[in-house]
Amino acid sequence: MDVFAVDEFVALVERLIGLPWPIRLDQFDSTAEQLGWSPTGNTGIFTGNFASGEQRIMCTKDEGMNASVFSIPFFKPEGEEIEKIGLANDAFVAYVAAGVEAWGKPFDSVIDRYAHVAWKYPQNVIADLIRYERFVHLRFYTPQGIRVY
């Protein structure tokens, strides 16, 4: 069993890359459902199932109401035990390896306490994978959000 859902990570980024940006955030609910996410009734907030269960996805918008940056807590183990905290690092390493295999060398990376690795695609989007002490987070910048990267 793939506890980190590496294939799901790659598949999600690929699906986000392929969306017909720009998409207005107030019209994103049907697209979210196609991604397997559930609208919450609040614009820009969705729920989805990831490697460590159901998580909340948040999306910011630009001045034109277009979706700009998605924040997705992809791996967040429950509990405070040191073993579970170590899982966040293992998940990050697994996702980076899968990303390098799928998309090649990242264009930006920092490896330290809060490590991150980012890939930029010809569609003018960025997938930024971030490892915090206790979880792994994916920040996806649409063409409308890329200027804030």
Where do the PLM segments sit?
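Short helix/turn-capping signatures at newly exposed starts of structured segments
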Residues: 1-113, 122-126, 130-149
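Short hydrophobic/aromatic beta-strand element in the GNAT-like acyltransferase core
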Residues: 116
